[in-house]
Every structure is written in C-alpha cells, then in structure tokens.
Amino acid sequence: MVIPVNLTIYVKLTGMIERLLTPIVLESLSWNPAVAILGPRQAGKTTLALEISKQLTSIYLDMENPEDKQRLESPSAYLNNHSDKLVILDEVQQYPDLFMSLRGIIDKGRREGRANGRFLILGSASNDLLHQSSESLAGRIQYMELSGLNPLEVLSADYDKQKLASLWLRGGFPSSFEASNDRQSLTWRTNFIRTYLERDIPTLGPRIPAETLMRFWTMLAHSQGEILNASKLAAALGVASITISRYLDLMVDLLLVRRFSHGLAT
C-alpha cells in the first residue's frame, strides 16, 4: 500500500486541535506494516486515528465493542478480506491473542506485495501491549506515544496567554482542555478519574480499592518533580513499601504517571 504523506502540514478538522503526531504516524505507516499508538484513555488516540482514516481507505474496529470483537472470531479470514485497507484496531490489549494472527497476515501480505500500512493499533496499557506485540510482531511494528495536549498544539501562530493558562489549569486531556468553562472541565476530570479507578483499572486485573488508588494518585500529584519517597507514601497509606512500588507500576503501565530516573541528566 502506497500512502501519500505531506509533512509540511498537519491534519486538521474545523474545531479540532492539530496533533503533532499525525504526520509522523502517516509517514511511519508508509514504511511499516503496523504502527502502535500508546497513550492513556481520552488522550485523543481514537480521534487521531479516525482523522487518519479520512485520508486512507480504512476500517475501524473497537475491541471493547462486542460486535467488532465478534467480527474477529476468525481474524485471518476477516482481515485478509480487507487486505487493501488500513485496519485500525482500538483498545487492542482487550484481545491479546490477536497479535499472532496479525503476524501471519503481515507476512502473507509481504509475500504478495502488500507490505506496509496494514494496521494502526491503539492501546491504553503500555506494558501489556508491548509484551504481547513485541513477541509476535518484532520487526513489523513501530511504537509511538500520544500524551495530552502540549503547548505547541494549543497555541496558535499568535501567542495566546489565555490558552496557555487554560492548559496549565485544565491539563492536556482534550475534553478537559476544550470544556466550555473551568467548572465543566473540573467535572470532566472528576468523572474521568472516578471511571478510571472504579471501572477501567479493575477490568485490567488489579483488585485495588478505588479509594486507595485515589489517595495514592493524589499524593503522587503533590509529589510531582520530587524524588519518590516510597516509605513516606507507604506510611501514609498504611501499606508496605513494596505495595507502593506495585501501585506505581500500575499507574505507569496505564500511562497516567511518568517515572524518571534519579540519575537522568537535565
């Protein structure tokens, strides 16, 4: 599949914020069979992918949608019928057995001259997805990360202090940043956190009380930029230090927290 890419412009829809990753993904699809975009829920992965689908002949499958998942009960048969399209697979960590099938489909396509631009994979849990895909798709996939909006994306050609102030106050999740007012933005963030803690995290396996994770997440926010003191956090939560490490690993895996090495050069 030949994918035309114009790197001098960003893909843009009226009323949407340009994402700097869009042209990079398009370029990567032109020379990789598969591209994976990792990022927390609501960071804009699906919006970015659907915007790309407007430029390329594509189909979109959400692995959290039972109907879409049913279509892939025989993945090779279904996907080979769409070998001329870019297949977008959203929340693919919900279907870990799919990766081995993707490997066979990609290798078959290479033999038949359809090497690149086959799959755009979206995932919200980095470690699981990386482990599942790296074993099956080594040499066939490129990984990228989409985080929240950054200043370059929210600022127009003219410097706008209000936009920048809103970014610092509301954060980089698009729905929070673009809310009609600060109150609605706060409501969105509150609901997002509650849903993540009470619904999304349990579906990934961990059985940790939502209230405990909320307290832990809040303490991490107050400790931003500081050296992690696991013992202090453990004492505050009434758990062992090793439990704090487990909680932190979970937050990092869900791309909700960034962890930097103490020895990282500045």
Give, region by region, the residue ranges found by the protein language model:
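Short glycine-rich substrate-engagement loop in P-loop NTPases that contacts/grips substrate
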Residues: 58-86
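Hydrophobic anchor at the beta1->P-loop junction of P-loop NTPases
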Residues: 37
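P-loop (Walker A) phosphate-binding loop of NTP-binding proteins
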Residues: 40
